[in-house]
């Protein structure tokens, strides 16, 4: 993929925006094409009452063949921290330049594993990176931005995850998720892969078994795949995850399903993800909260969290032009020159700029808008 910067043009046009009942004069401080199908605009918005906001947004044309999207993990690890700029510079390579990005999911800010590794940076919600499943589960508190492998059908909504494992005798067991931290309670079957820690970080007492994909199979959504046991089950807990394989963990009645397997046994697994009743096939998935704009209507989100109803730095990802355009937008805040905004205000501004659906990313001090010419 070749990405280049088209000649920039400074602009000083002024326009009026009515955001949640307040009139703002918006002066365009900067407008440029950053790369194929991608523009960036910077606005200074001022109200008659003296409120001022610096706004940075980008519009990305999904139909442009030279553009692709990726979720990027800090240090390419399940747990780890890294700035958006550092991620972009580190991931760029000849033929593929990461030139635009915003912060994403809420994440763990404390804690260590049983072996002493930091949990800081673990995503709270489901996450898929270039088709690789880093985390999957049904999380009704979080909203996902999802894009398929063809850069088509972008969707924002709450993902309902379902999974099923079937052994050779036809016995089935529901799969609760992938790479879940501290599983507890009830009957749970969880699959751990190479993107987790090198071990499952689970307590003793449940059942675990190391497995690998059968030849020619892929660990993906929407298509059944076969896995083969490579060892006998164990109840010791905290099992090492094979570099080229998986660990299947069973708790409660699901432990019996795991214990019934022996080395060489095969199971068939399938994962499905649905948003608003529609099956999705995530190649890129990022979680956050809240879903602030839905079908062109600003949603009531300020009551959900105190910070949502106060002026804060905010970042959002949005869909426009019937799914042909993705928007990134950040409003600076906690500054003498930029007040920040409420969740309903960033949603209303995105609506005025043409978006129909939006999700707020982790905002406040995490809000970041990075671009490189």
Predicted segments with their positions:
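Extended C-terminal subregions enriched in glycine
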Residues: 254-373
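N-terminal cationic-hydrophobic initiation segments that often serve targeting/anchoring roles
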Residues: 1, 91-93, 318, 351
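Beta-propeller domains
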Residues: 225-277
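Bacterial Sec-dependent N-terminal signal peptides
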Residues: 1-16
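Second-shell loop/turn segments in exported
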Residues: 71-77, 250-254, 332-336
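Short, functionally important structural connectors and interaction interfaces within domains
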Residues: 201, 217, 253, 284-285
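Zymogen propeptides
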Residues: 12-246
């Amino acid at each position: 993929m070749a990405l280049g910067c088209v000649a920039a043009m400074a602009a000083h046009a002024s326009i009026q925006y009515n955001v949640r009942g307040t009139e703002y004069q918006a002066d365009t401080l900067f407008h440029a094409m950053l790369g194929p199908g991608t523009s960036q605009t910077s606005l200074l918005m001022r109200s008659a009452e003296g409120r001022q906001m610096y706004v940075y947004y980008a519009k990305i044309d999904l139909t442009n063949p030279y553009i692709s999207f990726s979720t990027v993990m800090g240090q390419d690890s399940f747990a780890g921290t890294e700035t958006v700029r550092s991620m972009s510079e580190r991931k760029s390579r000849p033929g593929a330049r990461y030139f635009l990005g915003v912060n994403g999911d809420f994440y763990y800010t404390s804690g260590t594993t049983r072996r002493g590794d930091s949990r800081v940076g673990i995503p709270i919600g489901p996450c898929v990176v270039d088709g690789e499943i880093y985390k999957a589960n049904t999380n009704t508190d979080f909203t996902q931005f999802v894009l398929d492998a063809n850069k088509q059908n972008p969707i924002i909504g709450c993902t309902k995850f379902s999974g099923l494992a079937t052994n050779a005798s036809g016995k089935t067991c529901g799969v609760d998720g992938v790479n879940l931290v501290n599983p507890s309670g009830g009957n749970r079957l969880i699959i751990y892969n190479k993107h987790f820690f090198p071990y499952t970080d689970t307590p003793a007492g449940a059942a675990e078994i190391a497995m690998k994909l059968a030849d020619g199979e892929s660990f993906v959504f929407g298509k059944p795949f076969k896995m083969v046991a490579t060892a006998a089950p164990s109840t010791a807990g905290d099992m090492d995850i094979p570099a080229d394989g998986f660990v299947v963990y069973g708790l409660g009645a699901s432990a019996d399903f795991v214990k019934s397997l022996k080395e060489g046994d095969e199971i068939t697994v399938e994962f499905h993800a649905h948003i608003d009743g529609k099956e999705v096939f995530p190649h890129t998935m990022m979680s956050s909260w809240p879903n602030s704009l839905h079908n062109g209507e600003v949603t009531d989100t300020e009551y959900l969290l105190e910070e949502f109803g106060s002026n804060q730095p905010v970042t959002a990802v949005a869909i426009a032009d019937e799914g042909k355009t993705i928007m990134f937008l950040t409003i600076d805040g906690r500054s003498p020159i930029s007040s920040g905004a409420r969740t309903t205000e960033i949603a209303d501004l995105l609506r005025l700029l043409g978006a129909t659906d939006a999700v707020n990313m982790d905002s406040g001090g995490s809000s970041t808008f990075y671009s490189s010419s």
